[in-house]
A protein has these predicted regions:
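General beta-strand recognition
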Residues: 21-23, 50, 98
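N-terminal secretory signal peptides
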Residues: 1-33, 43
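Conserved, function-defining micro-sites of small-solute handling proteins
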Residues: 36
Length: 141
């Protein structure tokens, strides 16, 4: 447990991209803290959204702009250990952004994604079990 601003309600996810940390506020100015990978330069964002869907071992379909940048990527990948979304995914609003696991745990703490927030599979499984649909997510730069 770590201290956080008392301005956030219990159950809120606060993502600090500069710190490369995700906080799940538990109440009374306390939170669980997780390390994350964040968007690389040109792919960062800030704002408030909510968890709109949750998936275990999600399939992955790279967006068309990603396929243009990386034609070597598959057009679709079934969920599983090799899938870049990892063990769980929390979908953010109507965007293509997610909080998800990773098949590259060594990238946690780095700015490497296309705007999603990646966690170790162990951490995302824990977070997934703690948050319901509709959970408020605040992304700070």
């Amino acid at each position: 447990m770590v201290n956080v601003s008392a301005a956030y309600r219990s159950g809120t996810i606060v993502i600090n991209t500069n710190e490369r940390r995700l906080y799940l506020v538990t109440g009374s100015g306390q939170a669980l803290r997780y390390g994350i990978g964040v968007g690389r330069i040109g792919f960062t964002w800030a704002g408030t959204t909510a968890v709109s869907a949750k998936r275990e071992w999600p399939d992955w379909t790279p967006p068309s702009q990603m396929l243009r940048r990386r034609p070597d990527l598959p057009h679709h990948m079934a969920g599983g250990i090799e899938n870049p979304l990892g063990a769980r995914a929390l979908y953010l609003g109507r965007s293509m952004y997610r909080i998800h696991g990773s098949n590259e745990p060594e990238t946690i703490g780095q700015a490497v994604s296309s705007g999603c927030f990646r966690m170790t599979n162990e951490d995302v499984v824990d977070l997934y079990s703690r948050v319901p649909l509709g959970t408020r997510v605040v992304v700070l730069r």
